[in-house]
Amino acid sequence: MPEKYVAAIDQGTTSTRCILFRHDGSIATVAQFEHKQIFPKKGWVEHDANEIWNNTRRAVGEAMAELDISVNDVVSVGITNQRETTVVWDKNTGEPIYNAIVWQDTRTNDIAQRLAGDEGPDRWRKTTGVRLNSYPAGPKIMWILENVEGAREKAEKGDLLFGTIDTWLLWNLTGGVDGDNGNPALHVTDVTNASRTSLMDLKTLKWDEDLCKAMDIPQSMLPEIRPSIGDFRTVRARGSLAGVPIRGVLGDQQAAMFGQCCFGNGDAKNTYGTGLFMLLNTGAKPKWSDNGLITTVCYQIENQKPVYALEGSVAMGGSLVQWLRDNLQLIPNAPSVENMAKSVEDNGGVYFVPAFSGLFAPRWRPDARGAIVGLTRFANRNHLARAVLEATAYQTREVLDAMVTDSGVDINALKVDGGMVMNEFLMQFQSDIINTEVVRPKNIETTALGAAYAAGLSAGFWDSLNELKEQSTVDKVWKPKMGEDERKQLYSDWNRAVERTYNWEESTNEPS
């Protein structure tokens, strides 16, 4: 019997990939295409939504051709995407009226402040789960309607559609302007992506009418909200995946949770990418943070209650190593930072606080700026390299501590993924400073795997969450080796270093 596969479309910040997974969760093939990063002004980041759609088609076609398989060999397709990135397009032409505004973009800081008013960035957090800053999609839609000529009028007439990248891809995959087999294209999103807009009520999982009015966003623009795992219809009757059912849609960090099999209350994962993104499964009820975290939907299976999560994001992770390499030119390449860090016995009293654009969760100090603290003539570039890696671990502990406090759940192990998890020094130090096991899976492509798991589970390719957990394999586990006194001293010194960075920038904008 011919082997069957599940396809995952992984649309990220820098590239679009199609990965075909076997039944055992292993990767059969990968096709990847990068897209342009557009920086029109300081703090602005845009993508060409048409380029992303074209790259999606190319990646799917190349992956299918690489294995020389047909649509009959693909059971289902799942989609995972960069969250919050916002596309607004004309439903009559299929053309975006402006470039996609990327999640990193900070142009909406003023809009967010305007919305926050005297109540501050937490004004609607008990409804939406998110803070009012430049991250969520809602203020990005507002900016487009306020600044693109004719946009407001078209929106009021019902001619414009909004979507995060998942919605944009789904609309095109199901026919776009022409629809498919007499059906209009699908204009939908899933609960995880909708929870990043600042427009959805986390408890009802519906668009909040009062918030839409407050942001002056016509509800006719907004997609239908559906569970993450279920029947999203089939791909249009042309192209490399023609007729294949779309069965799973998840935002990238939630997909990584699903790929890490974080299905139980108290399961946590941290993704070490450009930034750091930690999520903690909090079960069937949303937990509201008193410690600077946001509340989000983790996933929802069709005909079941949603599962919620707490999330903390840190702006600088792997990008710190890039900064050492490209800006300071202290290291020849990214992998060399590990050997440099291991070449010294300790950090030499040096602490690096990477508050380049303020501090994110859980401190949320937009006034902070980066600093290197504790320098003496003894310190050298190896100490600085070590301090950079240690900063990543300290920031992770801050988020983890906040999660434990907010949830009341003890975290017995931290599952990790992302490019930096291959750095063994960092992983051991991470385990030491949080005094908890750190677990790296064999397959670190957990984001795409999560989309595949979601789609395959819905299609019956896998029978249950338990089956997925049983086939999940561990590559390595790090256990704490550091003594309690040393751990306390290091973390105390880190906190002193961080406090030195406060009140530097006069602007009160939220970091983004």
From Swiss-Prot:
GO terms for cellular component: cytosol. One of its GO terms (molecular function) is glycerol kinase activity. Inhibited by fructose 1,6-bisphosphate (FBP). Glycerol binds at R83, E84, Y135, D252, Q253. Its EC number is 2.7.1.30. Pathway: Polyol metabolism; glycerol degradation via glycerol kinase pathway; sn-glycerol 3-phosphate from glycerol: step 1/1. CDD domains: ASKHA_NBD_FGGY_GK (cd07769). ATP binds at T13, T14, S15, T274, G318, Q322, G419. ADP binds at T13, R17, T274, G318, G419, N423. It comes from the Bacteria. Disulfide bonds: none annotated. Sn-glycerol 3-phosphate binds at T13, R83, E84, Y135, D252. One of its GO terms (biological process) is glycerol-3-phosphate metabolic process. It catalyses: glycerol + ATP = sn-glycerol 3-phosphate + ADP + H(+). InterPro entries: ATPase_NBD, Carb_kinase_FGGY, Carb_kinase_FGGY_CS, FGGY_C, FGGY_N, Glycerol_kin. Keywords: ATP-binding, Glycerol metabolism, Kinase, Nucleotide-binding, Transferase. Belongs to the FGGY kinase family. Key enzyme in the regulation of glycerol uptake and metabolism. Catalyzes the phosphorylation of glycerol to yield sn-glycerol 3-phosphate. This is Glycerol kinase.
